[in-house]
Amino acid sequence: MSNAVSIRKCEISDVEILVKMRLEFLKEAGYVKDTTNVQELIQELEEYIRSHVNKDLFFWVAEIDTVAVSTGVLMFWDKLPICAGKQNGSKVGYVSNMYTIPKFRRKGIASNIVKEIIKYGKNLGMLKIMLHASEDGKGVYKNLGFTTNESFMEIKL
């Protein structure tokens, strides 16, 4: 077994991998506590990913010997124009679902996925990329140049 990590942008054929990694993320975060509705969740995830992959959601996977060890997602939206010129209709990105299997953490894998996401966002002409960081992930993002923005407010509906 080699330790070489390869990172690639996912295609629709990767749905099974993406669903598996999303389930691991949800279990670890405490959202999936039992197996009662797991099959239904798997079906919903498959449908959602198939309808959004490489349209408004872009997924990356890091693999070692073709085994997925980390994933990340970039979603985006077009920002409403605020003035004439450069920012008119520019895209804003949001990184979500960064997940690395525990035994592969602290090896720079997630950082490398985020670097690929940033590069892709730049190529799409994004104004900025945002995210909500876990405590464990804050260092990763700060080291890559992300800054804290405390201007967000939200209401849960």
Model-found features: residue ranges?
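Conserved acetyl-CoA pyrophosphate-binding loop and the N-cap/start of the following alpha-helix
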Residues: 104-116
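Conserved active-site tyrosine of GNAT-family acetyltransferases
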Residues: 141, 146
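A short beta-loop-alpha structural element at the N-terminal edge
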Residues: 6-20
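Conserved beta-strand in the GNAT
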Residues: 61, 67-76, 94, 99
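Conserved beta-strand-loop-alpha-helix junction that forms the acyl-donor binding cleft
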Residues: 129-139, 154-157
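Conserved GNAT acetyl-CoA-binding A-motif
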Residues: 114, 121-133
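Conserved GNAT-fold acetyl-CoA-binding loop/helix
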Residues: 26-48
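A short helix-loop-beta-strand connector motif used in the catalytic cores of GNAT acetyltransferases and
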Residues: 47-61
